[in-house]
Regions:
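C-terminal lobe/lid and adjacent interdomain/linker elements of RecA-like ASCE P-loop ATPase modules
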Residues: 4, 60-153
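GG-anchored amphipathic helix commonly corresponding to the ABC/SMC/Rad50 NBD signature/C-loop
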Residues: 5-6, 10-13, 18, 27-48
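Pre-signature/interface helix of ABC/ABC-like ATPase nucleotide-binding domains
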Residues: 17-21, 108
Length: 153
């Protein structure tokens, strides 16, 4: 076999079409999550890395993606690079990756956050987030914890 072409029918009643030609950013994110989830079931993958799997999605779909990734994390380590508050709220541990310039060189810093509420609030409202973002972040984290607790029962 020299090559493989994925065919997809993203909507009911549509014929199969080449994935690479028709898929949007959000559809690609969901496709890759589903594909990695299937592979994880048949492969002995200890760690799965998702780099901005939330690109092109929002609202209810972002919550579904967050829950799917949480489900995956029950059996293996998940590392996710995200800018999506709902996905960040679902995480057990947060690392803040930042860059700085020193002596004409760019340095990358990785810091484990002890309290990630402010970081989730920053994802909600930007660097200068309002006082309303923190309670919202706390609510998102509480909802995420309830979801994770429901998986244990």
């Amino acid at each position: 076999m020299d090559s493989v072409e994925f065919m997809i029918s993203p909507n009911v009643g549509e014929p199969l079409k080449p994935l690479a030609k028709i898929i949007s950013g959000g559809e690609m994110s969901r496709f890759m999550l589903a594909f990695k989830n299937i592979l994880a079931g048949v492969d002995d993958i200890g760690t799965m890395v998702f780099d901005e799997i939330d690109t092109g999605i929002s609202g209810n779909i972002s919550q579904v993606v967050s829950e799917k990734m949480c489900n995956i994390s029950r059996a293996r380590q998940v590392i996710a690079v995200t800018h999506m508050p709902s996905l960040a709220a679902m995480a057990d541990n947060h690392y803040l990756i930042s860059k700085s310039t020193q002596n004409g060189k760019t340095l990358t810093h990785v810091d484990l956050l002890q309290d990630d509420t402010d970081e989730v609030a920053r994802l909600i409202g930007g660097n200068d987030y309002s006082i309303y973002a923190v309670p919202h972040a706390k609510e998102m984290k509480a909802n995420a914890q309830r979801y994770k607790d429901s998986l244990i029962k």
